A protein has these predicted regions:
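Positively charged, small/polar-rich N-terminal and surface patches that mediate targeting and assembly
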Residues: 6, 13-137
Length: 137
């Protein structure tokens, strides 16, 4: 008996769910970037064929820490710097293209450029239709 279904081949972007149905593996990409880079990153992702994302204004710091400002003659330290958090869930085989697009558009070469986190996503459900998997995103 030969199983020639390409969805079961090594490296295939497909998995089976508990019901035995095939679905495309997905990745969640979270990127923390400088606010002024948002439009460039959005455009780069669009050029890579990646549409749809969630954008949040966040604050944080990494190695660059905060900075000192003077307000009404008093000096104070701003510990948390404004950043933008992008979140997108895409098919597994599109993750590398998305990461490269973000790096290409967000990188300035200076401290504070940000981070990208990539993780596996078990499932996604479109609330309106109940559609599941990669077709839901």
């Amino acid at each position: 008996l030969v199983d020639d279904d390409p969805r079961r081949a090594a490296g295939s972007p497909f998995d089976t769910n508990p019901e035995g149905q095939y679905h495309t593996r997905m990745k969640k990409i979270e990127a923390i970037i400088k606010p002024f880079k948002l439009e460039e990153v959005k455009d780069a992702l669009g050029e890579a064929g990646i549409e749809g994302m969630t954008v949040s204004e966040v604050k944080g710091f990494g190695r660059q820490k905060g900075h000192t400002e003077i307000y009404r003659g008093s000096e104070y330290t701003v510990d948390f710097l404004p950043k933008i958090k992008l979140e997108l869930v895409i098919a597994d085989d599109r993750a590398d293209a998305a990461v490269q697009a973000i790096i290409g558009a967000a990188k300035t070469g200076k401290i504070g450029d940000g981070k990208i986190f990539v993780s596996n996503v078990e499932d996604a459900v479109r609330i309106r239709t109940g559609e599941k998997g990669a077709s839901a995103v």
